[in-house]
């Protein structure tokens, strides 16, 4: 339940840890010194694309699609229900990650839209941010436009753009 997830996140914080999930597929990091596949996701080839998905099921498909297109992945994080770690936390990590050159987000909802907008505006000046959001809500469209996020209408479209940006 959400209440139990929050209690777990609170306990993790008290112990000095962060919590991914619940409902997360896990995370992948392909840096040669760290190569990590924590969860059920296979380890993709190393690359410059950072990917986040809230959906674990979709996450597996996203990694398979990246492999099919020949796109290497710097890191992949399946956020799950986001009791603690959010897309905003990932954006801050990827901003500092020298290997990440392109960021792709599959967002189902925003925890803190203002913070997202502020971070995306800053980070997007250095690294392009692509996003897929299942809603056709004009407010989401406006948020992405204001933040400088490139909105894709589908994962296929997002990966086509990511492929071009990763090569450039």
Enumerate the language-model features and the residues they cover.
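Catalytic-core regions of core metabolic enzymes
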Residues: 1-168
């Amino acid at each position: 339940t959400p209440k139990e997830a929050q209690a777990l996140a609170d306990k993790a914080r008290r112990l000095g840890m962060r919590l991914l999930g619940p409902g997360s597929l896990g995370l992948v990091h392909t840096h040669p010194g760290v190569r990590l596949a924590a969860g059920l996701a296979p380890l993709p080839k190393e690359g410059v694309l950072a990917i986040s998905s809230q959906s674990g099921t979709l996450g597996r498909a996203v990694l398979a699609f990246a492999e099919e297109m020949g796109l290497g992945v710097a890191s992949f994080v399946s956020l799950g229900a986001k009791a603690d770690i959010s897309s905003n936390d990932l954006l801050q990590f990827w901003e500092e990650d020298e290997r990440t050159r392109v960021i792709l987000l599959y967002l189902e909802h925003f925890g803190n839209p203002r913070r997202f907008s502020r971070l995306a505006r800053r980070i997007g000046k250095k690294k392009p941010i692509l996003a897929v959001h299942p809603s056709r809500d004009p407010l989401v469209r406006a948020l992405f436009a204001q933040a400088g996020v490139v909105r894709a209408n589908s994962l296929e479209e997002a990966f086509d753009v990511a492929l071009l940006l990763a090569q450039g």
